[in-house]
């Protein structure tokens, strides 16, 4: 395996770890810890967390796209094995879901917090939560496909 492939794989997996790990932390650790807070405290905190986390995910998505495309080409391109195509397809779906969260739902959260419309903000955060669960499941499935495709 050449150095370029090793570096690309490292960066790819780092991006995946940041994205999936962040979603797992947010859903299973942060969300339950914030449940007892009033909406006036909880929603501005979510807005702040989302703002920071989505920047990290945005960088991760770019890194994953670039390195994933490079790796796919190195391992056969259109003739690559089905697990590589499955990972690419699921990854693109996850990126589209993230795009919807970042560019459609997050602005709703931000507007609701700025206007102190707590029910609107809570609805938007609830939709983000459900889509994060979907993306987490898709990410775990993708990791499973990656492990199974290695032929250990």
Report each predicted region and the residues it spans.
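Polytopic transmembrane helical bundles with strong interfacial aromatic enrichment
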Residues: 1-152
